[in-house]
UniProtKB/Swiss-Prot annotation:
Pfam families: AA_kinase. It is found in: Cytoplasm. Belongs to the acetylglutamate kinase family. ArgB subfamily. GO terms for cellular component: cytoplasm. It comes from Pseudomonas entomophila (strain L48). One of its GO terms (molecular function) is acetylglutamate kinase activity. CDD domains: AAK_NAGK-C (cd04250). Substrate binds at G68, G69, R90, N195. Catalyzes the ATP-dependent phosphorylation of N-acetyl-L-glutamate. This is Acetylglutamate kinase. Keywords: Amino-acid biosynthesis, Arginine biosynthesis, ATP-binding, Cytoplasm, Kinase, Nucleotide-binding, Transferase.
Length: 301
């Protein structure tokens, strides 16, 4: 197959633009939270797998953390197990936790591993229970109204938060040229399982590894101002101002807090990426314009 002159010129431009970024990130670790539309479209799934394999091929170390909420919901429905949510979190009783483990640790995790491996990678699937990769504890949720003298504690079952990450295991896999693919299930002090928000797991893994980047794939173009324009580069201070003035609100707040915590915890930058764009991960790290919002501790020049 031959390229015409214009196509060949475009390929050369793309490679030329990518080269300084490749040099900058060789040997660095990037943690990518994979979810949303990027997990549902066959074209986007294939593009994501190729992106991950290419990153590894040029010397970058990707670590993938995935979600799977819709798939969990589908199986619960088929099993006639009712789903309840409190503050956006799935109430996870024992029966629901069994389904979460089956779907995240089994079906979804192995599908992603298989896809990456089919495109030339060496992915290995993990849950937080493997070698106690993600130690967790029960998440305490409270609610208080003006009439209450003390906050009400709400039991949402086997929902957890990260206590620690086994970085020795992840570093061993990365050095062995494997691509870790992590399901967000944590293990408690007594061996119990916890369902943990995938964004939070990705953020804590990035902090623990002192990753170069935390990349959160979403179903939006990035953080937007009140006029609907994408904000391509922000400092943590600017993000806090946008939260204070109500520009960032609702369902985006937990995701943004995770991105902020990661940067403040030692990650060089966090990225809110439009996962609906083919090859979004490569476009964000290897091009000048990117496809989302970059958050750092310092201003861009």
């Amino acid at each position: 197959m031959t390229l015409d002159r214009d196509a060949a010129s475009h390929v050369a431009e793309v490679l030329s633009e990518a080269l300084p970024y490749i040099r900058r990130f060789v040997g660095k670790t990037l943690v990518i939270k994979y979810g949303g539309n990027a997990m549902e479209s066959e074209e986007l799934k294939t593009g994501f797998a190729r992106d991950i394999v290419l990153m590894k091929a040029v010397g970058i170390n990707p670590v993938v953390v995935h979600g799977g909420g819709p798939q969990i919901g589908d199986l619960l429905k088929r099993l006639s197990i009712e789903s309840h949510f409190i503050d956006g979190m799935r109430v996870t009783d024992a029966a629901t936790m069994d389904v979460v483990e089956m779907v995240l640790g089994g079906q979804v995790n192995k599908d992603i591993v298989n896809l990456i491996n089919r495109h030339g990678g060496s992915a290995i699937g993990l849950t937080g229970k493997d070698a106690e990769l993600i130690r967790a504890r029960k998440l305490t949720v409270t609610r208080q109204t003006p009439e209450m003298t003390t906050p009400e504690i709400i039991d949402i079952g086997h929902v957890g938060e990260v206590v620690s990450v086994n970085t020795d295991l992840l570093n061993m896999l990365v050095k062995g040229d494997f691509i870790p693919v992590i399901a967000p299930i944590g293990v408690g002090a007594n061996g119990e399982s916890y369902n943990i928000n995938a964004d939070l797991v990705a953020g804590k893994v990035a902090e623990a590894l002192k990753a170069e980047k935390l990349m959160l794939l979403t179903n939006i173009a990035g953080l937007m101002d009140k006029q609907g324009q994408v904000l391509t580069g922000l400092t943590t201070e600017q993000v806090n101002e946008l939260i204070a003035d109500g520009t960032i609100y609702g369902g985006m707040l937990p995701k943004i807090k995770c991105a902020l915590d990661a940067v403040q915890g030692g990650v060089n930058s966090s990225h809110i990426i439009d996962g609906r764009v083919p090859n979004a991960v490569l476009l964000e790290i290897f091009t000048d314009s990117g496809v989302g919002t970059l958050i750092t501790n310092r201003k861009r020049h």
